Amino acid sequence: MPTISQLIRKGREEAVKKSAAPALKECPQKRGVCTRVYTTTPKKPNSALRKVARVRLTNGIEVTSYIPGIGHNLQEHSVVLVRGGRVKDLPGVRYHIVRGALDSAGVQNRNRGRSKYGTKRPKK
């Protein structure tokens, strides 16, 4: 326990917060090019074929990003927008692709939670 004089001289050291999405370099989103689009299986209690893409960002870092929603139009060389946000049951997947931005089309026939999947409001 430091004395008051020691605190006046040195002060308290602030703990450095570790970023959850370091490849974005403090940016909210980054643009990137898909280098590989594939499916992978989740961790133990779950079972599925999750759609993921390996993306080279504009800062040169290559990350694995999750493609949300049902169905997608992404292939190699597609230009995508990447945001932070991990997928709990896919180890090493710490980023999401933004649907409805750049080359990534929005999800078809989606009526609820449309803003998260880049879907326009349906005509009546």
From Swiss-Prot:
Looking at the keywords, is Ribosomal protein present?
yes
Alphabetized, the UniProt keywords read: Methylation, Ribonucleoprotein, Ribosomal protein, RNA-binding, rRNA-binding, tRNA-binding
Q: Note the superkingdom of the native organism.
A: Bacteria
Q: Which GO terms describe its cellular component?
A: small ribosomal subunit
Question: Any transmembrane segments, and where?
Answer: none
**Which SUPFAM superfamilies is this protein grouped with?**
Nucleic acid-binding proteins
Q: Which residues carry this modification: 3-methylthioaspartic acid?
A: D89
User: Which PANTHER family does the protein's record reference?
Assistant: 30S RIBOSOMAL PROTEIN S12 FAMILY MEMBER
The protein's matches in HAMAP family, at most eight in alphabetical order, are given as:
Ribosomal_uS12_B
Name used for this protein in its record = Small ribosomal subunit protein uS12
Q: Which gene encodes it?
A: rpsL
